[in-house]
């Protein structure tokens, strides 16, 4: 399943990020890509050795960790270190699949269950550059407002078509979920959404408490901690 997570960063935060990224050191995006991806990747990334990068990636981690909808959809166990990329002048990233595991500075290795892109450019400011994802439901083309994030299974083939006008800047990361199975995770997300909707409409009740009990028992049964 694919999820749109709005408002991860406020407009003020986005503007500050963009201003700081204008001063960043950018390097060839292939430095963080395996052999397969390097053949189709042509973009730039912020140098991960820079002081600015360390500060910005911490802010992204704090923002996603505090976003209730992100947590409900991803049920994250481990988040990768966020990276930042830039596309301009017909730069592109052809169809590829993210690696199944990635190194992690604290945990050694992590499994990539979900991929996330946090958009930092106004969609009207550039042409092309949509995130194109192929999954069992067909092809999806995603171009969200700055500050919004999209979550999708890391097992999906995806690409970024050439940016023919303007500049597309984004942050991206991977998530190892407490729930490995996409279908089980989607069911828990739907159940959680319905519980929250019923609570806001009718207040607390024995029936809602029973559904909460069901949710947590399923999470307890399926989670890998």
Swiss-Prot record:
Q: Out of the domains of life, which is the source? A: Bacteria
- EC number(s) per UniProt? 1.14.11.-
Entry's cofactor comment? Binds 1 Fe(2+) ion per subunit.
Binding residue positions for 2-oxoglutarate: 168
Which key words tag this protein in UniProt?
Answer: Dioxygenase, Iron, Metal-binding, Oxidoreductase, Vitamin C
Q: What class of enzyme is it?
A: oxidoreductase
> PROSITE patterns this protein is in?
FE2OG_OXY (PS51471)
UniProt name for this protein: PKHD-type hydroxylase YbiX
Q: Which organism is the protein's source?
A: Shigella sonnei (strain Ss046)
């Amino acid at each position: 399943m694919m999820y749109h997570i709005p408002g991860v960063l406020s407009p003020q935060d986005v503007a500050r990020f963009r201003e700081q990224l204008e001063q960043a050191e950018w390097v060839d995006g292939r430095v963080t890509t395996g052999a397969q991806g390097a053949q189709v990747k042509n973009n730039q990334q912020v140098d991960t050795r820079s002081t600015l990068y360390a500060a910005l990636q911490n802010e992204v981690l704090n923002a996603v960790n505090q976003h209730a909808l992100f947590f409900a959809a991803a049920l994250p166990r481990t988040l990768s270190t966020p990276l930042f990329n830039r596309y301009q002048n017909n730069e592109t990233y052809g169809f590829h699949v993210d690696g199944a595991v990635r190194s992690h500075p604290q945990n050694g290795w992590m499994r990539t269950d979900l991929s996330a892109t946090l958009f930092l450019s106004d969609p009207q400011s550039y042409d092309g550059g949509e995130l194109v994802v192929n999954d069992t439901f067909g092809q999806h083309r995603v171009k969200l407002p700055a500050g919004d994030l999209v979550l999708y299974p890391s097992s999906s083939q995806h690409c970024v078509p050439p940016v023919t006008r303007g500049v597309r800047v984004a942050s991206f990361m991977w998530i190892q979920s407490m729930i490995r199975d996409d279908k089980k995770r989607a069911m828990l997300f739907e159940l959680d959404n319905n519980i929250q909707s019923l609570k806001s409409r009718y207040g607390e009740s024995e029936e809602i408490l029973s559904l909460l009990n069901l949710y947590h028992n399923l999470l307890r049964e399926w989670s890998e901690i």
